[in-house]
């Protein structure tokens, strides 16, 4: 499996839309602490599996972020803070991650996961009551014998599981190994 590129929009530390192109062969992500390497890893994992890694908690789905006496994460917190701060009442902020991959047969796939948050009236921007956050939307597009095929939600998850079966998912917080 070859990852051709990733486009990240308003996801965690990534503000607005940013695209990274990857070349064939080995690609290294190197940088100082706090510069977005772990958030990039989260973007890959979120687009494929709908989860992000939270230190001290582990893998969590963004549709159900953890709430406990020791830790509370608001439903909107994986969306970029600058985008949320700049939003006006009734603005919709979209967070998304899209990857383009090529399988071993040369077939291209575009996988995209997105979520939208609507800015509500009457609360400070960083209040949980200030946002109405929708569920994750998942889409997989690829060419088929009948033209471009687009799969959504459960069918898209099935296609991702076909492309990345459990037996080849070697994932830890510090590295991502794809076939």
PLM features: residue spans?
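Glycine-centered tight beta-turn/hairpin loop motif at sheet-sheet or coil-to-beta transitions
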Residues: 13, 104-106
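Short, hydrophobic/aromatic-rich segments at coil-to-beta transitions
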Residues: 4-6, 91-98
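Glycine-rich phosphate-binding loops of NTPases
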Residues: 60, 69-77, 81-84, 108-173
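Intrinsic-disorder/low-complexity, polar/charged segments enriched in Ser/Thr/Lys/Arg/Asp/Glu/Gln
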Residues: 17, 94-96, 110
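Residue-level recognition of well-ordered beta-strand positions that form the cores
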Residues: 7, 98-102, 112-114
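Pre-Walker A-like glycine/lysine-rich segment at the N-terminus of P-loop NTPase domains
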Residues: 1-54, 59-67
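A short catalytic or substrate-binding loop motif that flags glycine-/basic-rich loops and adjacent residues
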Residues: 87-94, 104
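Conserved small/polar residues in nucleotide/adenosyl-binding loops
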Residues: 174-179
């Amino acid at each position: 499996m070859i990852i051709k590129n990733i486009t990240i929009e308003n996801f965690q530390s990534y503000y607005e839309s940013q695209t990274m192109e990857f070349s064939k062969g080995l690609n290294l992500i190197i940088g100082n602490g706090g510069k977005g390497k772990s958030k990039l890893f989260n973007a890959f994992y979120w687009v494929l599996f709908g989860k992000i890694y939270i230190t001290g908690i582990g893998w969590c789905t963004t549709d159900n972020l953890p709430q406990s006496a020791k830790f509370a994460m608001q439903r909107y917190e994986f969306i970029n803070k600058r985008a949320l701060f700049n939003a006006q009442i009734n603005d919709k902020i979209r967070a998304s991650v899209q990857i383009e991959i090529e399988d071993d047969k040369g077939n291209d796939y575009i996988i995209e996961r997105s979520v939208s948050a609507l800015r509500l009236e009457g609360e400070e921007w960083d209040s949980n009551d200030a946002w109405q956050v929708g569920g994750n939307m998942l889409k997989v597009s690829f060419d088929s014998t009948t033209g471009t095929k687009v799969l959504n939600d459960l069918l898209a998850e099935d296609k991702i599981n076909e492309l990345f079966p459990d037996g080849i998912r070697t994932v830890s917080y510090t590295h991502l190994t794809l076939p």
